[in-house]
Amino acid sequence: MAKKNKKVVTQGIAHIHSTYQNTIVSFSDLKGNVFAWSSSGAIGYKGTKKKTPYAAGLAAAAAVEKAKEFGLKEVSILVKGVGPGKSTARKQIETSGFTIKDVKDVTPTPHNGTRPPKKILKREK
């Protein structure tokens, strides 16, 4: 069987989706086709450790290593969500050696749409 050649992507988009429970970092080409991704859960964290900023930084570092195998040089960063790991993941991508074109926050905000889910209750011990 012939060895499949990896496609070379020099410009791309880094998508950071940060929720209260997990952080997902994915790299796509300019058309939106994802070629590298990682998340806090995918690198081995479970439960409440997935939502930590440290786990988000490790997930971003793992995604960056996968993206560098495709020859990525220039990145636009899109940040979505309100989770605790979004700034750590963004900083990890910025310090990884890519040329950063721009950083955008694309968190969807409702204009009084549907009713939001009820708040998470924290139990006192």
Curated annotation (Swiss-Prot):
GO CC annotation terms, alphabetical: ribonucleoprotein complex; ribosome
Compositionally biased region (Basic residues): 116-125
The GO terms describing molecular function are: rRNA binding; structural constituent of ribosome
Q: Which Pfam families match?
A: Ribosomal_S11 (PF00411)
InterPro entries reported for this sequence: Ribosomal_uS11, Ribosomal_uS11_bac-type, Ribosomal_uS11_CS, Ribosomal_uS11_sf
The disulfides recorded in the entry are none
Residue span of region Disordered: 101-125
Keywords per UniProt = Ribonucleoprotein, Ribosomal protein, RNA-binding, rRNA-binding
Locate the coiled-coil region(s) and give their ranges.
none
State whether it acts alone or in a complex, and with which partners, per the record.
Part of the 30S ribosomal subunit. Interacts with proteins S7 and S18. Binds to IF-3.
The family note in this entry says: Belongs to the universal ribosomal protein uS11 family.
According to its UniProt entry, the function of this protein is described as:
Located on the platform of the 30S subunit, it bridges several disparate RNA helices of the 16S rRNA. Forms part of the Shine-Dalgarno cleft in the 70S ribosome.
The name of this protein is Small ribosomal subunit protein uS11
Species of origin reads Mycoplasma sp
